[in-house]
């Protein structure tokens, strides 16, 4: 019977440890041969900064506008948010997709357009679902007609409304007023009138021609988008890919691309008008403004340093849009922090001066009072027209009293 001494046991243990260590080294060497070693960490070859930047640009709209959708659903009202933002981004994205059919550009920007259309359709549906009565067409303000503006400007410079008689005093005064300086001022005023009409078109507080994007029937929004997208893409595809009319396709592509960039750069204008009208930031989320500014910064950086085959117009319009976003930032700071203090200084004895959170309620109350006065005026007019019928007159007075109560 053989026995194992302490020395033999120690030797056996050392041999076992050495064998296990060698086996683990062989296993690790085999594993490392399949996995590249980069600074002690495994990083896939496809996970580059370019890949991260491309996906940030493509999917940023999901976060920026997704938070707005959640906010509207939570508050059950779209007051303070302009649905014109949906129109701007949807039209611009459709134009960019049709432009891609003529002049292919970075696939990242095309992917962003598709994602933008998806999230804007959801945002439009949510905004229409909780659209307040203030945004309905019949409750908006009428804007002066262009002919009326031109008539006033003509009378201001030439002091003559109708055509003067030949060799009359008015005719002589009209000839004297036709100086170069006067004509230059008149032309400048006409330009300002056209510019004023354009700005009012982007102001959602005023009525537009044909009630564009101010329809009371929600189905009209979807009909317009379906018709616009179908006609735009089919015409572009037919000219560029079926007819192969290169000269016409290039000219059409330049128009579509420039128009799409212009429409997208005007995105902040409706929101600027809404904030100016309400004199409050109620309903407008700071996260949306931050996402706009971050998106503009990321887009400009990408266009300058990372993109290929990009026209300088992309950068110019992106800078213009960013300047409007900074203007909204100034509005937010003013109406959030300074305007309440200035209002309190003008009304120091008013201890019940409303806060920023009550601005939208005040606006709704003022609008209701205005509508109430219009109803009372209409009822009084009807009562005067039917004064020969005492019974009808009494009914009109009762209705007016009911509205007042």
Swiss-Prot record:
InterPro entries: PQ-loop_rpt, SLC66/Scramblase_ANY1. Disruption phenotype: Mildly sensitive to duramycin (phosphatidylethanolamine-binding cytotoxin). Suppresses the growth defects caused by mutations of flippases including NEO1, DRS2, DNF1, DNF2 and DNF3, as well as of the DRS2 regulator CDC50, the DNF1 and DNF2 regulator LEM3, and NEO1 interactors MON2 and DOP1. Its main location: Golgi. Disulfide bonds: none annotated. Pfam families: PQ-loop. Residues 252-309 form the PQ-loop domain. Residues 1-51, 98-103, 199-223, 276-283, 336-405 are cytoplasmic. Residues 379-405 are annotated as: Disordered. Phospholipid scramblase that transports phosphatidylserine (PS) and phosphatidylethalonamine (PE) bidirectionally from one leaflet to the other of the phospholipid bilayer to at least partially collapse the membrane asymmetry established by NEO1 and other flippases. The PS scramblase activity has been disputed. Functions in the trafficking pathway from endosomes to the trans-Golgi network (TGN). Present with 937 molecules/cell in log phase SD medium. This is Scramblase ANY1. It comes from Saccharomyces cerevisiae (strain ATCC 204508 / S288c). The gene is ANY1.
């Amino acid at each position: 019977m053989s026995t194992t001494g302490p020395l033999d046991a120690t030797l056996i243990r050392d041999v076992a440890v050495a064998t296990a260590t060698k086996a683990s080294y062989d296993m690790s060497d085999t594993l490392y041969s399949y996995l590249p070693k980069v600074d002690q960490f495994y990083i896939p070859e496809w996970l580059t900064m370019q890949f991260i930047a491309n996906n940030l640009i493509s999917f940023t709209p999901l976060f920026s506008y997704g938070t707005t959708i959640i906010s509207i659903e939570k508050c059950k009202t779209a007051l303070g948010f302009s649905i014109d933002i949906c129109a701007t981004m949807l039209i611009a994205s459709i134009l960019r997709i049709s432009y891609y059919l003529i002049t292919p550009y970075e696939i990242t920007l095309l992917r962003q357009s598709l994602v933008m259309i998806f999230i804007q359709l959801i945002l439009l549906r949510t905004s229409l679902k909780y659209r307040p009565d203030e945004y309905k067409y019949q409750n908006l303000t009428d804007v002066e007609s262009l002919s009326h503006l031109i008539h006033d400007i003509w009378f201001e410079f030439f002091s003559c409304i109708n055509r003067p008689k030949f060799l009359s005093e008015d005719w002589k005064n009209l000839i004297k007023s036709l100086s170069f300086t006067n004509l230059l001022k008149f032309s400048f005023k006409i330009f300002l009138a056209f510019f004023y009409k354009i700005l009012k078109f982007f102001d959602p507080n005023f009525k537009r021609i044909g009630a564009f994007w101010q329809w009371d029937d929600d189905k009209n929004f979807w009909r317009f988008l379906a018709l616009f997208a179908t006609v735009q893409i089919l015409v572009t595809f037919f000219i560029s890919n079926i007819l192969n009319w290169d000269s016409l396709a290039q000219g059409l592509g330049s128009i579509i691309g420039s128009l799409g960039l212009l429409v997208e750069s005007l995105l902040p204008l409706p929101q600027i008008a809404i904030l100016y009208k309400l004199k409050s930031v109620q309903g407008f989320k700071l996260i949306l403004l931050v996402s706009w500014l971050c998106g503009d910064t990321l887009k400009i950086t990408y266009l300058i340093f990372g993109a290929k085959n990009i026209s300088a117009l992309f950068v110019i319009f992106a800078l213009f849009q960013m300047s409007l976003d900074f203007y909204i930032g100034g509005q937010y700071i003013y109406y959030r922090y300074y305007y309440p203090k200035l209002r309190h200084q003008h009304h120091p004895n008013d201890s019940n001066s409303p806060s920023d959170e009550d601005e939208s309620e005040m606006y709704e109350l003022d609008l209701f009072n205005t509508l109430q006065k219009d109803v009372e005026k209409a009822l009084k007019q009807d009562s005067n027209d039917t004064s020969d019928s005492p019974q009808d007159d009494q009914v009109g007075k009762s209705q007016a009293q009911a509205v007042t109560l």
